[in-house]
Swiss-Prot record:
This is Protein PA-X. It is found in: Host cytoplasm; Host nucleus. Plays a major role in the shutoff of the host protein expression by cleaving mRNAs probably via an endonuclease activity. This host shutoff allows the virus to escape from the host antiviral response. Hijacks host RNA splicing machinery to selectively target host RNAs containing introns for destruction. This may explain the preferential degradation of RNAs that have undergone co- or post-transcriptional processing. The record marks K195, K198, R199 as: Important for efficient shutoff activity and nuclear localization. The record marks K202, K203 as: Important for efficient shutoff activity. GO terms for molecular function: RNA binding.
Length: 252
């Protein structure tokens, strides 16, 4: 699994995942499934934010080629991938600037168009189960939740999927590719252990609390990219490099 992760994810994503695990005293060489899961989550967060800007009229637009116009503002602030101290500094700055309520837990992104924090989830299980876990943990309707699965399903707070269908399809395609590549290497079954999932489901169901007022809907429609964190946004050369990395697995 470790070899797969290093072959199929951008080196910057791998480095961020290693740092995140070491921050919590975890070893990527031992907890390889977690290593793969963290890399996948990081990539989805970066892909979620890619190419999305806000123009001078406050409208959300997509710019995929070349350097964006200087008048454009990046729609999403990336919080995931930073060390905890820096991440909370970014969150506090956003709250002080926008007046939004400070979340109890570190979110993954901030959406400047909708003025809300976003929690991204990537699950190997049923999307509605994972959604409930996230909602029960966060216990706040102010943080928007968006869950993706490796099967092309998704679920979001109040069925508001934030992104256009093409952007979401790009994420779903990448997740499906990761699943196929794991399966071709005989890694998928160990990544999704039925016994482990069953035990976790029983534990989750025992600890669940009602999520009143959270309207959800599952989308079953199945229809690259990485921003640097400092500086935050990617130039066209880096985008092209990541596109090549994105296609690496498919070419094997």
């Amino acid at each position: 699994m470790e070899d797969f992760v290093r072959q199929c994810f951008n080196p910057m994503i791998v480095e961020l995942a290693e740092k995140a695990m070491k921050e919590y005293g975890e070893d990527p060489k031992i907890e390889t499934n977690k290593f793969a899961a963290i890399c996948t989550h990081l990539e989805v967060c970066f892909m979620y934010s890619d190419f999305h800007f806000i123009d001078e009229r406050g409208e959300s637009i997509i710019v995929e080629s070349g350097d964006p116009n200087a008048l454009l503002k990046h729609r999403f602030e990336i919080i995931e991938g930073r060390d905890r101290t820096m991440a909370w500094t970014v969150v506090n700055s956003i709250c002080n600037t926008t007046g939004v309520e400070k979340p109890k837990f570190l979110p993954d992104l901030y959406d400047y168009k909708e003025n809300r924090f976003i929690e991204i989830g990537v699950t190997r299980r049923e999307v509605h189960i994972y959604y409930l876990e996230k909602a029960n943990k966060i216990k706040s309707e102010k943080t928007h939740i968006h869950i993706f699965s490796f099967t092309g399903e998704e679920m979001a707070t109040k069925a508001d999927y934030t992104l256009d269908e093409e952007s979401r399809a790009r994420i779903k395609t990448r997740l499906f590719t990761i699943r196929q590549e794991m399966a071709s290497r005989g890694l998928w079954d160990s990544f999704v252990s039925p016994k482990e999932v069953k035990r976790q489901l029983k534990k989750d169901l025992r600890s669940q609390e009602p999520c009143a007022g959270l309207q959800t809907k599952v989308s079953r429609r199945t229809s690259p990219a990485l921003k640097t964190l400092e500086p935050m946004w990617m130039d066209s050369n880096r985008t092209a490099a990541l596109r090549a990395s994105f296609l690496k697995c498919q070419k094997k």
